[in-house]
UniProtKB/Swiss-Prot annotation:
Family: Belongs to the phycobiliprotein family.
Membrane topology recorded in Swiss-Prot or TrEMBL: Peripheral membrane protein
Subcellular localization, as worded in the UniProt entry: Plastid, Chloroplast thylakoid membrane
Record organism: Galdieria sulphuraria
InterPro entries reported in the protein's UniProt record: Globin-like_sf, Phycobilisome_asu/bsu, Phycobilisome_asu/bsu_sf, Phycocyanin_b
Keyword Hydrolase assigned: no
Modified residues (N4-methylasparagine): N72
Gene name for this UniProt entry: cpcB
Main subcellular localisation: plastid
One GO term of the biological process aspect: photosynthesis
Positions that bind (2R,3E)-phycocyanobilin 2: N72, R77, C82, L83, R84, D85, M86, E87, I88
Identification of the protein by name: C-phycocyanin beta chain
Length: 172
């Protein structure tokens, strides 16, 4: 966001002009949208443990074979690895939300994840279901209108959903 401000100021300075009303309005909108992003990321971060835990609980309720002997999340070590991976994915989704760009999610989290899971025998479809459950929970928490920046957040919530969808697709 600061790069955008610096760019506008540099352009005006190069022309020896004050910032125009149009430029100020665009920067004001950027700040407003940035505040919404901060609110969303703050809510997701503050509720990350509950988002991951509830998603895992729902996943294992729907797919109990995962936590039964021989299942991919059977034993405490495997369960901990599953929860850790879900938390990492949620963390990188939050980075993408704040940046407004999925490249950090792709580059640092998702690239190669499917292949890693396949090599380890982790069922990608089950991981995708867990990610979908995190998505539903995170959007419900982030979309709660109490105590956040007012305004229409439907476009931002749709964007948030796309980051989770990207992660779910990447592991299948």
């Amino acid at each position: 966001m600061l790069d955008a401000f610096a760019k506008v100021v540099a352009q005006a300075d190069a022309r020896g002009e004050f910032l125009s009303n149009t430029q100020l309005d665009a920067l004001s909108k950027m700040v407003s949208e940035g505040n919404k992003r901060l609110d969303v990321v703050n809510r997701i971060t503050s509720n990350a443990s509950a988002i991951v835990t509830n998603a895992a609980r729902a996943l294992f309720s729907e797919q109990p074979q995962l936590i039964q002997p021989g299942g991919n999340a059977y034993t405490n070590r495997r369960m901990a690895a599953c929860l850790r991976d879900m938390e990492i994915i949620l963390r990188y989704v939050s980075y993408a939300i704040i940046a407004g760009d999925s490249s950090i999610l792709d580059d640092r989290c998702l690239n190669g994840l499917r292949e890693t899971y396949q090599a380890l025998g982790v069922p990608g479809a089950s991981v995708a279901v867990g990610i979908e459950k995190m998505k539903d929970s995170a959007i419900a928490i982030a979309n709660d209108p109490s105590g956040i920046t007012t305004g229409d957040c439907s476009a931002l919530m749709a964007e948030v959903g796309t980051y989770f969808d990207r992660a779910a697709t990447a592991v299948q």
